[in-house]
Amino acid sequence: MTKVCAVFGGSRGIGKAVSKLLAQRDYKVAVISRDLEVAKAAAAEVGAHLALSCDVSKENEIQDTFKEITNNLGNVDYLVNSAGIRRDALLLRTRSEDIRSLLSVNLVGTIQTCKLALRSMIQQQGGAIVNIGSIVGHKGNIGQSIYGASKEGLIGFSKSLAKEVAKRNIRVNVVAPGFIHTDMTLGLEEDSLTKMVPLGRFGDPEEVAQSVLFLLESPYITGHVLVVDGGLQLQM
């Protein structure tokens, strides 16, 4: 039976590359973005089956999104959480509203989508979740204390959840990218930052998508953090 895949943040960057790769493998893909028109455009481009809008900081919108997916495609088998934001600043200069936004979107939103997806997966007696973290969650970085906290929190959450649901044949893993060519890395000084990467370049979203697919389809891997960073962690 064809798998149903929900990709939050699936309209751009890594999420879009994941949506495209899953669609190419003939999975039923729902592309989810805050902006419905952007989601529709991305879904049409990558060959997805459904486009939906959802603000993951709002629990009621997440609930409505899963209802739409179930009604249109069926129960969710695979969940990919790629929705995220960045608000870089030294902690003393970080606004309280930015702290709340970062934690709400990057961490709490992912927790809520996982909670809703589990209901479908338990009915299906199996499933897989891949949450997109960051090398910053592993190693830390100046000016990204809250962002790093949200991503490291995601790792702790994912490992704990993997233990909770393993007996139900549900797997939970994390992909932690380094410097990847996406909207989030626009404006960075690529020439100087590339010198920190042993492989000598930024990665492409498609390379991260391959790692996500690997974890979704690997039946004996759970609770794992797969770092995709060109060796950046070796230098940090």
UniProtKB/Swiss-Prot annotation:
Q: Which InterPro entries match?
A: NAD(P)-bd_dom_sf, Sc_DH/Rdtase_CS, SDR_fam
For binding substrate, which residues are annotated in this chain's numbering?
134
List the disulfide bonds in this chain: none
Q: In which pathway does it act?
A: Lipid metabolism; fatty acid biosynthesis
Record Pfam families: adh_short_C2
UniProt EC number: 1.-.-.-, 1.1.1.-
Q: Does the keyword rRNA-binding apply?
A: no
This protein's name: Carbonyl reductase family member 4
Gene Ontology annotations for the cellular component aspect, listed alphabetically? mitochondrial matrix; oxidoreductase complex
Q: Which UniProt keywords apply?
A: Fatty acid biosynthesis, Fatty acid metabolism, Lipid biosynthesis, Lipid metabolism, Mitochondrion, NAD, NADP, Oxidoreductase
Q: What molecular function terms (GO) are annotated for this protein? A: 3-oxoacyl-[acyl-carrier-protein] reductase (NADPH) activity
Query: How is this protein organized at the quaternary level?
Result: Homotetramer (in vitro). Heterotetramer with HSD17B8; contains two molecules each of HSD17B8 and CBR4.
- Give the GO biological process terms: fatty acid biosynthetic process; protein heterotetramerization
- Spell out the coiled coil positions from the record: none
According to its UniProt entry, the function of this protein is described as:
The heterotetramer with HSD17B8 has NADH-dependent 3-ketoacyl-acyl carrier protein reductase activity, and thereby plays a role in mitochondrial fatty acid biosynthesis. Within the heterotetramer, HSD17B8 binds NADH; CBR4 binds NADPD. The homotetramer has NADPH-dependent quinone reductase activity. Both homotetramer and the heterotetramer have broad in vitro substrate specificity and can reduce 9,10-phenanthrenequinone, 1,4-benzoquinone and various other o-quinones and p-quinones.
